[in-house]
């Protein structure tokens, strides 16, 4: 990887590996893709927005990395099956999956419609399950691999976003189950809750939400990055 992006980890840490990143067109997914590519991985970007995926692929290749992209709505089973099949056909395997795609909106429980509830749960839970299952069945069951599920800090629940809190808690349980059931195939399954990150995802929230997060999580109570972590790149 040449000038433009430099990782803090060892060079070529993931050389020769194929890693899928969902939600790879923006925010945490975009930054994860850059990090993985800088460490030698070929990154398969998955998302719904073609233009965003093309932009991130271009960024990575201009930095000297390797990436391609697949337009897919992870909420749809057949689309997920076809996407994983396409990745395996192109690269012969899937070494790792970063289940990052997700979304939610601020609203109290009594105002959430069934349509709104299902949209969030299908993205934040069902879609992640489908991606993990197909990566396992189509590649990892025979070769081993790693699954990283990006969740949220929902251990104190998520008032104002109950649909997302329920889905994220479900994803943590799924992660633990997958770690046990798929261990015999050499598959590691972990969940990561990055905390509050100032990325493009914040654009979907009212302006006062960002101010609330900064006041709720002062830098003295956070990791060294400070209160509201700024995504890099």
Give the positions of each predicted feature.
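The beta1-alpha1 cofactor-binding region of Rossmann-like NAD(H)/NADP(H)-dependent oxidoreductases
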Residues: 50-51, 71-83, 114, 232
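Catalytic loop of short-chain dehydrogenase/reductase
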Residues: 148-170, 175-184, 196-197
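Amphipathic alpha-helical dimer-interface segment in Rossmann-like NAD(P)H-dependent oxidoreductases
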Residues: 114, 123-142, 179-180, 184
């Amino acid at each position: 990887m040449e000038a433009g992006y430099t990782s803090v980890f060892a060079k070529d840490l993931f050389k020769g590996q194929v890693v899928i990143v969902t939600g790879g067109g923006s925010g945490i997914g975009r930054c994860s893709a850059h990090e993985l590519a800088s460490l030698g991985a070929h990154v398969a970007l998955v998302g719904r927005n073609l233009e965003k995926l093309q932009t991130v692929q271009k960024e990575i290749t201009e930095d000297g990395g390797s990436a391609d992209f697949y337009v897919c709505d992870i909420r749809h089973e057949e689309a997920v099956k076809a996407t994983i099949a396409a990745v395996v056909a192109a690269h012969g395997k899937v070494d790792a999956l970063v289940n990052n795609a997700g979304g939610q909106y601020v609203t109290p429980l009594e105002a959430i419609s069934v349509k709104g509830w299902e949209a969030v749960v299908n993205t934040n839970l069902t879609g992640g399950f489908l991606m993990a299952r197909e990566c396992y069945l189509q590649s990892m069951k025979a070769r081993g691999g790693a699954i990283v599920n990006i969740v949220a800090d929902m251990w104190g629940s998520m008032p104002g976003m109950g649909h997302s809190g329920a889905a994220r808690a479900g994803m943590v349980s799924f992660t633990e189950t997958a770690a046990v059931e798929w261990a015999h195939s050499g598959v590691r399954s972990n969940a990561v809750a990055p905390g509050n990150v100032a990325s493009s995802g914040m654009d979907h929230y009212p302006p006062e939400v960002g101010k609330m997060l900064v006041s709720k999580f002062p830098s003295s109570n956070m990791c060294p990055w400070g209160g509201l972590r700024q995504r890099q790149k």
